[in-house]
Amino acid sequence: MRISQARRTLVLALSAALLTAGAAQAQDKNSIKVGVSVGNGEQIFEVVKKVAARDGLNVQVIVFNDYQLPNAALASGDLDANAFQHQPFLDNQIKARGFDLVPVALTITAPLGFYSHKIKDISALPDGASVGIQNDPSNGNRALLLLQSAGLITLKPEAVKNNTATPLDVVTNPKKLKLVPLDAAQLPRSLDDLAIAAINNDYAEKAGLSFTKDAILKEAPKGPYANLIAVRRADKDKPWVQRLVKAYHSPEVKTFIETKFNGSLIPAF
């Protein structure tokens, strides 16, 4: 009886251990889908993918041309993570659309630039010029702050403080510039119709524009706009998230960013 009872206890203990191990394994994944933006983000994640594979994590890279789509895809479960946005953009999306998403790691800083097909120096910007800026709140605010830093406009102090500037917050505009909000992806294609346009680095890269060589007005490289990896809140502590972050923060990925982009993208880790 005692031997039988001991065996029964051992079997139950082993079963419990196997169930616990199985549950932990079920929480982890060996294959994930990550949404990135076309261009720079796509190139970086090809390296991340190789590093992650050595750790047994298969990363499927899903490329997006529209900033409005990756968070919706993540929230709906079509993606496991995304890596394309900075914190102000994520905050705005959460507020506007109710996504339950959280950042888990920083990736790169991508300074914003203004580009032109018509002038070579920002000092040559004519009166009444059409100026393209992004129509999403966070990047539009960013473009307006850059115009203010060049003395081209001034903004309401409260809007600057809260990072909520829109064209309606312009207080002075001595050159009578015409601010033209457009979708971020459309701005490179609109350069022939605009005097200058604010273009995010991933779209600039795709259009054959170099931040270091072609931008005529440049955002400081260090600022609050470091990009990040986001996941659903329910997933933030899962082992595969740590493995993904470890792969992105590897020396191999850092070296690739520094050598490939020559200052137009800067590792934020």
Predicted regions and their residues:
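Ligand-binding "clamshell"
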Residues: 92-104, 117-119, 193, 198, ...
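Short, well-ordered beta-strand elements
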Residues: 28-39, 59-63, 130-131
